[in-house]
Regions:
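Helix-to-loop junctions at the C-terminal end of transmembrane segments
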Residues: 67-80, 289-300, 386-387
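Cytoplasmic helix-loop-helix junction between adjacent transmembrane helices
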Residues: 114-149
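Intracellular juxtamembrane helix-capping segments at the cytosolic ends
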Residues: 42, 122-136, 342-355
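C-terminal transmembrane helical hairpin of 12-TM major facilitator-type secondary transporters
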Residues: 279-285, 289-291, 296-350
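Hydrophobic core of transmembrane alpha-helices in multi-pass small-molecule transporters
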Residues: 25, 96, 107-123, 247, ...
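Extracytoplasmic
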Residues: 15-41, 46-50, 67-71, 159, ...
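Helix-loop-helix hairpin linking two adjacent transmembrane segments in secondary transporters
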Residues: 151-200
Length: 425
């Protein structure tokens, strides 16, 4: 009877999932996914070219890439202070975006972006995966999918809201709105987060008393780990193919994301249509992330790698031909809802399947840091290519090739890993 009652108790880990959803909603959904709204209005008012202006997002991503390694080490050494690091990141990121609203020179945006990068990783995957891995053994995939779906919810809501605010009150008010709304999302998350179940006198979801968790480390279940070490992984071709695939995927995905609204308005669509299309992308993402995770569990790593690449390829092709008919922006929205989701959900799944869980965190952090280059330079690359070609058409042609390369690389990595059995060592 007591066991039955215990099972029916609400598990605080789902509060942690909700908190992670809020972190992703602000850190990715607002701070990253809504940046494209500001490209045209800022450049037109301040006289910037699009390439140099969008470099500020590259700077923020580049600084964040190295900050991720630092936070990874800090989280390892001082796990009890993770919530404090997230609180610090909240202040830094919200402050930086408010600072954008006061900027008048390019270097203002660059300096604030570098400042933003020092805190942005606390609101990203490293915090999310650490918290969820601490709290869940079973249903970890579901918890992860739900958490990352937060970016789609917030972006779907905030894209049309910010577009309207920028049109009616100017881009400066738009940046201020981003800062204040994000602060309202992040403060409750910081207050509710608990780093481990031990802080609430609990065990991870799926671990029963006496199973897995030792007396001295109640928050860390002792599970049998399989796979290869990071030292072994970096000596395999599969590891570098995995990174190349992730790098290409990030280049195409982030290269499109920040320029969709600008491109659609350039080819004759209204700002309302463009923002609605981007908002629909974020809406589709809410369901796509959860659906992709469930499908991956069913079909295995090699088909999952193929599906991942196809989602991105279909997105670029749909955007390339967005001018064919008035329905095409919405076809793109459907495709990119899945394509954009491949920048989060497949990474941890494929790395875990290809290389195992023995040193998953070490392999994942290294691969993510390197592949983050694609996320950081892609918006600026698209802007620079636009300035060079005079339109986005050839930019999308290039990204079609990049998406094919991503598909081939990820599939090859999964096949090699399966043949060699890296994940089963």
């Amino acid at each position: 009877m007591q066991q039955t009652k215990t099972k029916k108790k609400f598990f605080y880990g789902w509060v942690i999932v909700f908190c992670c959803t809020l972190l992703v909603a602000a850190g990715t959904g607002i701070f990253v996914n809504c940046l494209g709204i500001f490209v045209k209005p800022v450049c037109e008012e301040l006289g910037f070219d699009r390439g140099p202006f969008t470099l500020y997002s590259t700077i923020g991503g580049f600084v964040g890439m190295f900050a991720m390694l630092a936070y990874g080490e800090l989280y390892r050494r001082y796990p009890q202070h993770i919530r404090k690091f997230i609180a610090l990141g909240t202040v830094v990121c919200c402050g930086a975006f408010y600072g954008y609203s006061l900027s008048t020179k390019l270097w203002h945006f660059y300096a604030l972006a570098a400042f933003y990068g020092t805190g942005s990783m606390t609101l990203a995957g490293i915090s999310i995966t650490t918290l969820i891995n601490n709290w869940f053994v079973e249903k970890r995939g579901l918890a992860t999918g739900l958490a990352f779906a937060g970016s789609g919810v917030s972006a779907a809501v905030m894209t049309p809201v910010l577009t309207t605010i920028v049109a009616d009150f100017g881009w400066r008010m738009g940046y201020r709105t981003m800062s204040l709304v994000s602060l309202c999302l992040l403060v409750p998350a910081v207050l509710l987060i608990r780093v481990s179940p031990a802080e609430k006198g609990l065990l991870p979801y799926g671990v029963k008393p006496g199973e897995g968790a030792g007396e001295n480390t109640p928050h860390i279940p002792v599970l049998q780990q399989t796979g290869i070490t990071r030292r072994q992984a970096v000596k395999t071709p599969a590891f570098y193919l995995q990174i190349l695939g992730m790098l290409c995927l990030g280049t195409a995905g982030m290269g499109m994301s920040g320029h969709v609204i600008a491109y659609l308005t350039d080819i004759g669509y209204s700002e309302l249509t463009a923002s609605t299309a981007m908002s629909l992308v974020m809406t589709v993402m809410i369901f796509a992330k959860i659906l992709l995770g469930a499908v991956f569990d069913k079909i295995g790593p090699v088909p999952s790698a193929v599906l991942t690449g196809i989602c991105m390829l279909a997105s670029v092709v749909a955007l390339r031909f967005a001018g064919v008919g008035s329905f095409m922006p919405y076809v793109f929205s459907l495709c990119f809802g899945f394509g954009y989701s491949t920048l989060t959900v497949p990474y941890s799944y494929l790395i875990g399947q290809n290389f195992g869980t023995r040193e998953f965190a070490a392999i994942y952090s290294l691969a993510s840091m390197i592949s983050s280059l694609g996320n950081s330079y892609a918006p600026s690359l698209s802007g620079t290519l636009y300035d060079f070609f005079g339109s986005y058409v050839n930019v999308w042609n290039i990204y079609i090739v990049v998406s094919v390369a991503a598909t081939v690389s990820l599939t090859a990595a999964a096949k090699i890993s399966r043949q060699k059995g890296y994940g089963r060592y």
